[in-house]
Amino acid sequence: MSEGHIAAISKTNKRKNRRKKRRTQDVSDSSSDSSSDSENSSVEDNDTKLETVEKAASDVEDVTLSDIDMDKEEDEAALDDKKASRKEGSVLSSETVDKLNKVGLTTSDLTGNNGIHLGNIDLNKMSATLDESSNKLLENNKDKNGLKNQYLSMLFESYGDDMNELRNAPDFTSKTLVMLANVLKDGGDMFDLETLKTIVEDK
């Protein structure tokens, strides 16, 4: 039997014993001494069986736990061996270093040749590229903010009656209105820029 089966059996036996004990107490009050003696002996038999099952379960549990402990110790020893071998292999040979130095790096418009040489980088070209990228980013943010505002106005048009009902609520304040507007506006973030444009244009 597995450990789970033994535990399940012992739990059901405990429940049965509790039920039987309660019944024997109820019955012993109303029945004769001879019948209560026979019931008590059956309860004692069940207690003995229960103790035997519990003892067997604890033996199985001890064996299982000791197996697990041994497995953990073996795993820890294997990890220590791996760490030691990594430390030994972390020193690169001179041949490996030479091969790595000969590997050519990718070229770009900014470097103009293989590898990165700070003296060869055209800083003006890099500056222009960065400025262009930041301008595009600003335009996209402006577009997105404008689209979010249009999305918010579309929501207020569609759900204006519901918004008016919210305003009439006793706990509605000016802070609540601002928070609600910001939440609805930020709801546009769940769409990418093109989808948001499509939604706003289709209104």
UniProtKB/Swiss-Prot annotation:
PANTHER family reported in the protein's UniProt record: RIBOSOME ASSEMBLY PROTEIN 3 (PTHR28127:SF1)
Taxonomic placement: Eukaryota, Fungi, Dikarya, Ascomycota, Saccharomycotina
Bias-annotated ranges (Basic residues): 12-23
Comp. bias regions, Low complexity: 27-43
Protein name per the record: Ribosome assembly protein 3
Signal sequence residues: none
Described purpose of this protein according to its UniProt entry: Required for efficient biogenesis of the 60S ribosomal subunit.
Gene Ontology CC annotations of this record: nucleolus; preribosome, large subunit precursor
Subcellular location: Nucleus, Nucleolus
Domain of life of the native organism: Eukaryota
Compositional bias of kind Basic and acidic residues: 46-58, 79-89
